[in-house]
Amino acid sequence: MRANIPTVSDDAVELLVRNEAAQIIAVSEDKDRLSDYQIFLSDFPREDILGMSIGKRRIYISHKLAKLASKRVSYLWLLRQTLAHEVAHETAGHAMQNGLTWFNRRTLGPGISSVDVGLPQSVTLRNYSVDKELEADSKGLGYWERLGWDCRIWVRILEGFEKQNYAGDVFHPTEKRLQQARGICLREEKDGVI
């Protein structure tokens, strides 16, 4: 069964997202493959889904997040965090590991379901493991460092999730993500990066 995640067309917001993604891709392992990236906007039924990568350099970003990012700098940083995380999934090849595409393995727990992203219930999704999610955060923070972006902003975003009692889901545990980000940021401080 071929399934497509529903997308939204919004030229002004798409331009913002593409420009932000281009900065990140330019400092990534894919710096010579910018034109291969396809970035789509989607109104995910589950509002806490900010973005996702599905392989072959295809990334979906929450339309709501992108609209807010065009108006408020705090959301712009959240968009940048989301893009860096999703680009990192792509550069790490997470969607294609084990010879299985993102759409053809069952979720093994309460992660993101097909319905959460606007697909029929008959479509099964494969969530990335916690280790792969943490790897994407780590690589994403590396892109931020290369761009000269302050890692403390990444940490504050996760602290904001924690203050709102948003624990994430089984594959995106806020506490583990925050602990890792603090450690990476502390190393950057010690190395004189920030």
What are these regions (language model features)?
Residues 1-194:
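A Zn2+-metalloprotease active-site environment signal
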